[in-house]
Amino acid sequence: MTDVLVLYYSSYGHVETMAAAVAQGAREAGARVAVRRVPELVPEAVAERAGYKQDQRAPVATVGELADYDAIIIGTPTRFGNMASQMKNFLDQTGGLWAEDRLVGKVGSVFTSTGSQHGGQETTIQSTHTVLLHLGMIVVGLPYSFKGQMRMDEITGGSPYGASTLADDGDGGDRQPSANELDGARFQGRHVAEIAAALVAGRKREAA
């Protein structure tokens, strides 16, 4: 069985919701899925005043466990077109894994959330891809076989780089991931799990 890690950071719950959909899609493809979050860096009192969602059920990940999975799907909100500092801090600790080639050949993928339609979804995903490539991972996106990313009848996230959602309703209020955005997240989870399973099976045949 293929092992998939959905590793995310979420301030207000939007990426957490997308992570659950990604995990569902990976399970539908037959993968064994773990959902983990990275540690929060914001002091608890500050996070509480800012309204952060602090009751997230996913266990906190450790850097060392990344090597245990065949695929890692990363979810992060955008911060000025880049990943959140919480995710960057976590990934910056993978130097030991990098030095030992522990993540080389594993599948990596990224999804995100932004506050606005043009808030840096693609640059956030692509800049995170850079880290995955340095770690030697095989980067997988959200192919156009997911037709939902081509919709023109509604404002929606999603691009060939990865699933995404918009967190602001345009009037400063909260917007939750739409049905189409969640469909994209599930599709990405299935797609990554299927590719990882094919790679694992191929390597087992070569080793036999």
Swiss-Prot record:
InterPro entries: Flavodoxin/NO_synth (IPR008254), Flavoprotein-like_sf (IPR029039), Flavoprotein_WrbA-like (IPR010089), FMN_Rdtase-like_dom (IPR005025), NQO (IPR037513)
GO CC term, one of those recorded: membrane
Cofactor requirement: FMN
Catalysed transformations (reactions): a quinone + NADH + H(+) = a quinol + NAD(+); a quinone + NADPH + H(+) = a quinol + NADP(+)
SUPFAM superfamilies named in the record: Flavoproteins
Keyword Chloroplast: no
EC number(s) from the headed UniProt entry: 1.6.5.2
Amino-acid positions noted as binding FMN in the UniProt annotation, renumbered to this chain: 10-15, 78-80, 113-119, 134
UniProt name for this protein: NAD(P)H dehydrogenase (quinone)
Source organism (scientific name): Paracoccus denitrificans (strain Pd 1222)
